[in-house]
Amino acid sequence: MAAKQGIKSRIRPISLALPLVAFIAITFLMPLGNMLKESVYDAEVADALPNTMRLLNDWDGVELPTEEVFRTIAEEIVVLQENRTIGKIGIRVNRVVSGTRSVWGKTARRVKDVETDNMITTMVEIDDRWSELDLWQGIKTAGQRYSAKNYLQAVDLTRADDGSIVSVDEQRRVYNTLYVRTLYVATVVTLLCLVIGYPIAYAIAHTPPTLSKILLLCVLVPFWTSLLARATSWIVLLQSQGVINDFLVSLRIIPDDGRLSLIYNMTGTLIAMTQNLLPFVVLPTYAVLSSIPPTYMRAAASLGANPVQAFVRVYWPQSLPGVASGCLLVFILSIGFFITPAIVGGTDGQLISNMIAYHIDTNNWGLAAAISVIVLVSVLILYVVFDRWVGVDKLKLN
């Protein structure tokens, strides 16, 4: 009897946690697993051109495929045209070999009415790109069900004809630049939030209760406003004929013909993101500062320390758990920020999250998933490094 009671006492807390486990599995683990699968698995071309892909598996890639391969792909192109799916295959292969999308539609319209004993010559006459090895290599690459091509493309690499991994052409190198820019923006926004947020948190923690509540309310107000509305409001403030420029011109700080460019660039991204993420530094820092006894500073002063020495040697070290919590939150959120750079960032202020959204909009789920995995792994590495240097157990959020 006692044993049964012991088992029940152990099962009861586990059963209470089951809804939470199910929620995490459905909303986090399953989407994460699907994202990992999408980044390495793509059967669209393989399912559309099964016979062609079977023949291309034995192709050496040195010379053009045989007449059998040409005839087989021509027959399958006709079927795709009848099913109205030829455009999808053209888009998919075009992601591997740019400039080949039109080949598929052009060939589909003309090859169905052709009866010939030499399909190689016929298809080359329809479009001479069928005589290029790059196109056939692209078809073979796009037809692989499992591959790392999305991860290679996500770091501006590609696989050469001989199988080696090389950098893509300079004009196509965009992702590594966006990674660096995203890290730069996340770092700058984190520092700006710290520089601006620490004094605000200090003021909230050390002012009379009435004023402290008003300041805290001002910090919390942005959470009650839509992120989209806040981002859009910055257009009114920062544009060349906006409030800030008009104010500076009215004070004759800048001439009317020398208005500042504060929107649709990196400056707009930094300003808007700092304002949006500032509460995530203020609140954890305030929670820690309010718990520091004021007697510590008085004791340091009584021992001969001036205000600066007392702050640096006594007050600042005790506030680090809150500072570290806020900075970590802001940095991680900055890496994945999307809507604000999209609205106020222009071309120069776009981050890697905007590229993920672009590939989702164009149905390039594999590349979007690969970039997302890279960003996720980067954040996990950051977390591990932070835990090693600072210690996550020392963080305080309340």
Where are each of the predicted segments found?
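Transmembrane-helix boundary motif in ABC transporter permease subunits
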Residues: M1-G6, V189-L220, V236, S291-M297, ...
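C-terminal transmembrane helix and the adjacent membrane-cytosol boundary/short C-terminal tail
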Residues: Y286-M297, A301, A369-N398
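Membrane-topology segments of multi-pass transport proteins
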Residues: M1-S15, N34, E38-N176
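Amphipathic cytosolic juxtamembrane alpha-helices at the membrane-cytosol interface
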Residues: Q5-I7, T210-S212, M266-G268, T295-S325
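Interhelical loop and adjacent transmembrane-helix boundary motif
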Residues: S9, A46-N51, L55, A342-D387
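Transmembrane alpha-helices
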Residues: L20-A22, V219, Q275, V281-Y286, ...
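Transmembrane alpha-helix signature in integral membrane proteins
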Residues: R172-A203, W316
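Membrane-interfacial helix termini and adjacent extracytoplasmic/periplasmic loops
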Residues: A2-G6, R230-T274, V344-T347
